[in-house]
Amino acid sequence: MSVLERLAATVEARKGADPDSSWTAKLLARGPEKCAEKFGEEAVEAIIEAVRGDRARLASEAADVLYHLLVMLAARDVTLAEVMAELERREGTSGIAEKAGRG
């Protein structure tokens, strides 16, 4: 099991946890909209670090983005396995062809 899979399992386990005992549980308790807002904030921070060119800071912010993506997905009951299956479905397809195939 990869670190991303372990993190996704931890996020899923926190769905029923006491919001006072877990940051993840607190985010999930605040609903999908708050989870999406936090994801957006972290994405912007990653973009800023990408522009600045600080590799270590970008890696740190990218880790935050991945965590908050998993929380946002969990808030809408979308699993990492579903996302991975979609990536596998797209694998080997050019981006132009994949986008055209969406309709």
Swiss-Prot record:
Keywords: Amino-acid biosynthesis, ATP-binding, Cytoplasm, Histidine biosynthesis, Hydrolase, Nucleotide-binding. Its EC number is 3.6.1.31. It is found in: Cytoplasm. One of its GO terms (molecular function) is phosphoribosyl-ATP diphosphatase activity. Pathway: Amino-acid biosynthesis; L-histidine biosynthesis; L-histidine from 5-phospho-alpha-D-ribose 1-diphosphate: step 2/9. It comes from the Bacteria. It is an enzyme of class 3 (hydrolase). InterPro entries: HisE, PRib-ATP_PPHydrolase-like. It catalyses: 1-(5-phospho-beta-D-ribosyl)-ATP + H2O = 1-(5-phospho-beta-D-ribosyl)-5'-AMP + diphosphate + H(+). GO terms for cellular component: cytoplasm. Its main location: cytoplasm. Pfam families: PRA-PH. GO terms for biological process: L-histidine biosynthetic process. Belongs to the PRA-PH family. This is Phosphoribosyl-ATP pyrophosphatase. It comes from Cereibacter sphaeroides (strain ATCC 17025 / ATH 2.4.3) (Rhodobacter sphaeroides). The gene is hisE.
